[in-house]
């Protein structure tokens, strides 16, 4: 018996996603059905702003963070002639740093060393922008 029926929870099949967390690169497809609708299994899901992949490598989340930070940093560099150092630092703290910090305890320890270095380079670029170098 499925427990969500016992507590009268409606399960929207079109929004419901299934993911199997495993270290193996290849794994069996789960066959989960609700009445007649089959729930699709995904390799990555977006949950509360974090991208979780089936092997918890964190690579997709790193790429998302880098994309957001780089796009905002390009905009700030275009406006840099109008910004004093104090305002630059405030904008970096308000617009860029939250992307590095958001849920980092869940994805940062699991990423490969090469991604950690790429994130460090991105943070160094942010610091150079703050200092006007």
Model-derived regions, located:
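Short, conserved micro-motifs composed of acidic
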Residues: 2, 9-43
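A terminal-accessory region detector
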Residues: 113-133
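Basic, alpha-helical interaction scaffolds
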Residues: 36-107
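Short, glycine/acidic-rich hinge or "gate" loops at secondary-structure transitions
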Residues: 10-14, 110-117
């Amino acid at each position: 018996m499925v427990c969500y029926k016992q507590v009268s929870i409606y399960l929207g099949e079109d929004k419901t996603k299934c993911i199997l967390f495993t270290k193996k690169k290849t794994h069996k497809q789960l066959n989960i059905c609700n009445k007649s609708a089959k729930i699709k299994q995904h390799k990555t899901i977006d949950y509360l702003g974090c991208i979780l992949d089936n092997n918890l490598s964190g690579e997709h989340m790193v790429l998302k963070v880098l994309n957001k930070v780089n796009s905002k940093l390009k905009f700030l560099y275009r406006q840099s002639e109008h910004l004093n150092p104090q305002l630059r630092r405030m904008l970096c703290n308000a617009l860029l740093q939250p992307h590095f910090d958001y849920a980092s305890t869940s994805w940062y320890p699991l990423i490969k060393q090469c991604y950690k270095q790429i994130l460090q380079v991105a943070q160094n670029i942010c610091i150079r922008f703050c200092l006007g170098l």
